A protein has these predicted regions:
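Short internal beta-strands
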Residues: 2-10, 100-102
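Short, charged/polar "capping" segments at the starts of alpha-helices
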Residues: 10-18, 108-109
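Conserved catalytic core of nucleotide-sugar-dependent glycosyltransferases
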Residues: 44-46, 90-157
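GT-A fold catalytic core of metal-dependent nucleotide-sugar glycosyltransferases
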Residues: 33-39, 57-112, 141-142, 148
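Active-site-proximal specificity loops/subdomain of glycosyltransferases
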Residues: 14-65
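A glycosyltransferase accessory/donor-loop signature
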Residues: 130-131, 136-221
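Short, surface-exposed amphipathic charged segments that create phosphate/polyanion-binding patches used
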Residues: 42-54, 113-116, 198-204
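A structural signal for isolated positions on well-ordered beta-strands in alpha/beta enzyme cores
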Residues: 3-5, 32, 73, 182
Length: 221
């Protein structure tokens, strides 16, 4: 069975009906909406771009918002799944808490020889030992039980309220779970750059893509 929970604060009723219609004819799929605003009252969300909104932070708190769940896949809404997502759910994390795809865009920024600001930000400001192993936060598989044992809501709140983060939830996940993450197959988070480079991206893309990520100037959330 597939239990899909949409975390939101302003989806209109008409769009909710459209989303719910996606499960028509499927008896093993449930789609529900979780209104998050009431649970976020004490947080002050720092956003470094108009492209981002407070929804960007929700993934950090989902294990606490869903106390009866032990494990889950958390993904952005600007993704298209092109295979059975259950294959990712049963990915063996071993002793790790989280699984995600290595952020190859970040690696490019880290290797910028003319501007060392990104490398300095990750190693000195965030204190991440090896930023080249950072994973992209757009799609992750998370062991909720292990996560809650390691990370308190107060610790998450401290980072949300007091740090000026560039990639917000992704940065916090990588800070708190460094050494406890598994890098999974790149096909689970294949980014499509919707600008001039799109033809090159398609030409170089893996023949089998499981998940497409549409990165654009304006996120749909």
């Amino acid at each position: 069975n597939y239990d899909i929970i949409v975390f939101e604060r302003e989806i209109c009723e008409d769009n909710k009906k459209k989303i719910l219609s996606l499960k028509d004819g499927m008896n093993n799929v449930s789609i529900r909406f979780f209104f998050v605003s009431d649970a976020m009252g004490s947080f002050k969300f720092y956003l470094n771009s108009t492209r981002l909104s407070q929804e960007t932070y929700y993934g950090l708190l989902i294990p606490y918002l869903l106390p009866n769940y032990h494990k889950g896949i958390i993904m952005d809404c600007d993704m298209i799944v092109k295979t059975d997502i259950a294959r990712l759910y049963y990915e063996d994390l071993g002793e790790n808490v989280i699984g995600g795809v290595n952020d190859i865009v970040l690696q490019g920024w880290l290797n910028d020889r003319e501007n060392k600001d990104t490398y300095t930000y990750y190693t000195e400001y965030l204190k991440i030992k090896n930023p080249y192993k950072c994973f992209n936060g757009g799609l992750i598989i998370l062991n909720f039980d292990k996560y809650k044992k390691l990370i308190t809501e107060n610790k998450i709140s401290d980072y949300i309220n007091n740090y000026k983060l560039r990639v917000v939830d992704q940065d916090i996940f990588n800070i708190l779970l460094e050494g406890k993450s598994k890098l999974i197959d790149f096909r689970w988070n294949h980014m499509i750059w919707v600008k001039g480079a799109i033809s090159e991206a398609i030409a170089d893309a893996p023949k089998s893509v499981r998940d497409s990520y549409f990165k654009s100037r304006k996120a749909p959330y």
